[in-house]
């Protein structure tokens, strides 16, 4: 099974855009986990393990191994999220 995390941080405008587009898609909660990339102003251990260097970053893991990453919000439209949810929603 693939776990999909959208890494975001507080005050990040591109993150807000990506989250807003994601939340327009029915069933997103069953597919994507919104994950805070920072704790107390520092990258979280999980974010570091996933290679996150900027937000928003999307990371897909299968059996704990990174299988895909995507950084930046420019392509994280509602159509992108809809396709992601449709592809991974019935696994």
What are these language model-derived features?
Residues 1-28:
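Local sequence-structure signature of Cys/Sec-based thiol-disulfide redox active-site neighborhoods
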Residues 5-8, 28-43:
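Thiol-based oxidoreductase modules, predominantly thioredoxin-like and allied folds used
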Residues 13, 53, 67:
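Nucleotide phosphate-binding site architecture
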Residues 13-14, 41-42, 76:
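Short alpha-helical
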Residues 46-49, 84:
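CheY-like receiver
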Residues 48-59:
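Structural micro-motif
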Residues 59-91:
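Non-catalytic, surface beta->alpha helical segment in thiol-disulfide oxidoreductase systems
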């Amino acid at each position: 099974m693939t776990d999909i995390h959208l890494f975001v941080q507080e005050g990040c405008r591109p993150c807000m855009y990506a989250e807003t587009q994601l939340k327009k898609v029915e069933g997103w909660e069953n597919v994507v986990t919104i994950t805070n990339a920072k704790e107390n102003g520092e990258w979280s251990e999980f974010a570091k393990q996933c290679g996150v260097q900027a937000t928003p970053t999307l990371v897909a893991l299968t059996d704990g191994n990174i299988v895909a990453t995507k950084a930046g919000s420019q392509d994280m439209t509602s159509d992108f999220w809809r396709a992601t949810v449709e592809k991974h929603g019935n696994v």
